[in-house]
Amino acid sequence: MSAEKNQNKTRKLFAPRDPEEAQRAATPLELLFDLIFVVAIATAGQQLHHAIIEAHLWHALPTYVMVFFALWWAWMNFTWFASAYDNDDTLYRCLTFVQIVGSLVMAAGIPAVFQEHNFDVIIIGYVIMRLALVTQWIRVAKHDPERRVTAYRYAVGIVLVQLGWLIGNFSAIHMTPLLFLILVLAELAVPLYAEKYAVTPWHPHHIVERYALLTIIVLGESIIGSFAATQEAFSNHDVNFKEIFLVIGGLLMMFAMWWVYFDRSHHHHQRRGVQPFLWGYGHFFIFISIAVLGAALAAAVDVSTQHAHISSQMMGWLIAACLAIYSTYIWLFYEAFDLSGWRRWLYPITILILFTIPLFFADIGYIVFVMAVVYILRLVIAKLYLNNCNDKRMAAST
C-alpha cells in the first residue's frame, strides 16, 4: 500500500496550486533552499567587508550589486514558481536540489568576481539553476494547458537570456557594466511578457511569507556577520565606550529595520496586475540594503579599532545610504501616497538627518549610535501619532 502511495507521488500531475488555498505556508524544502542561499549571500558580504576596509568601496560596490542581483533573481524565480506549482513530487524535489547545487557553485565563484572580476564559476552555477527551472516550466506546459503559452514563454525567455549571459562572459565581448544592465533588463522583462498571456496561480499570502522569511534571514546573516567582526576585534584589545556604542547602535538599527518591515501588512500589494511586480522587484532594494548594512557594520568595527583604510565619515555615509535606500522603499510603497499631513514626510526628513550626522561626530561608534537613535525616534513618533489618531477616531465614533 505504501509502495503504491509513493508511486502515485512520483507520478503526480504537475497541476497548478490553488491561489486561495487556506493556511498555505512555506515548505521545509523552501526553507532549506533559503538557508543554502544564505551561504552565497554571506560569502558576498564577506568580500564586500574586506573591500570596504581596504578602501576599495567604489570598485567593490558595483561588483556586489551585480553578484547580489544574480543571487536574488535566482531566489525570485524559484519562489514565485514554487508558489504556483510546488506539488512536492520526486522530480520537483530533485530539480530543486539541482538548483541548490547551482547556488552553492555560485557561492564558490563569488571571491573570483571580487578579486579578478571573473564571472566564470558564478555563471556556470547560474546555468545549472536555470536549466533546472526551464525543466520545471516545460513540465508546467505539459500539465497546465490553460497556461501552456505562459510556460513556454518563461522557458524560451530564460534560455535566451541565459545564452546572453554565456556569450557575454565567455566570448570576446566580455561582461561590461552596460551589457550587464541590458541582460538584467531582459531578465526582468521575461516574467512581465510571460504573464501577459495568462497569470500563474501564485498564492498572495504564501509570497508575502516567503519574502518576510528572506528578510529575517538576511537580517540574521547581517547581525551574525557584524557580531563575528566585533568578537574578533574585542578579543584582541580592551573594549572602550566608542565600540560599545557601535555595537548597541548596530543592534538597534537592525531591530528598527525589522520593526518597520513587519509593522505593516504587505498583502494589499498582492493584487493582480502590475503592482505585484513592483512590490516583488522593489524588494531587491530591501534585501540589498540590509545585506550591505551588515557588511558596513562589520567594517565599522575595523574602522573603530583602526584596522581599516576608510574614514569614519565615509563609513557613516555608507550606513546612512543603506538606511536611506531601505526607508525610501518603505516610504514609497506604504506612506508617501497613503498618509496625509506631516507624518507623510517623516521618512524623507529622517533620511536628511541621517546624512548630516557624520558631519558632527568624528568616531564611527558615535555616528552609528546616533543614527540608530534617530531612526528609532522616527518609529516612536510615528507610532505615538498613529495611536493618538486612532484614539481620536474611536472617541469621535462613540
Give the label of every model feature segment:
Residues 2-27, 31, 36, 42, ...:
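Predominantly late transmembrane helices and immediately cytosolic-facing juxtamembrane segments
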Residues 37-38, 49:
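Short acidic, Gly/Ser-rich segments with clustered Asp/Glu that frequently serve as metal-coordination loops
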Residues 45-59, 83, 112-113, 364:
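Short, hydrophobic transmembrane alpha-helix segments
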